[in-house]
Amino acid sequence: MKTSLLRRTIIVSLLAVVSLFFLYFLTTGSSAPVHAQPSEKLEMTGNITNQAAAEACLAVLKENLQAASDQDATAYAATLVAAARAETTQELAAFFAEEQLQHTLLSFEVVKQETESMLVAAQQKTISPKDSSYRDHITEAYHTFVKEADGWKIQETVMTNTEFL
């Protein structure tokens, strides 16, 4: 009786290990991840309840990334909430002196949209055109936009899921 129970326990354990092993290889396959390709007309996706507001936030994000690519700290700061502009401009001046990067928006998905705020998940590609220690990558960025007196502005950005190229 004990032998039979021991045999079943070993078989069940082996099946569990084999299943975990199979699941691991199934989820970490060697296929390359698929990334959206940049285009002139980027398609907005997600929970869009106000098309005009979503388009305004998309325009702000494009301006933000273009200003970063152009190393224009003033234009970059203009896309941020008023409270963050002065400090960010000073920090960017030092960063722009060391690195020249090109930023490309690959996708724009509205996660949550309210009258005065919007959460957007965007896929962004950042590359260094010159030989530098900066690592080219694609990242998912969660941008929180808020509506201020002068329009939609970026309040916060959280970067996640960075894949180095």
What are these regions (language model features)?
Residues 59, 73-121:
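Short solvent-exposed beta->alpha transition segments
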Residues 19-23, 28, 113, 123-128:
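Charge-rich, low-complexity terminal tails
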Residues 61-64, 92, 99, 103, ...:
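Polar/charged side chains located within well-ordered beta-strands of beta-rich proteins
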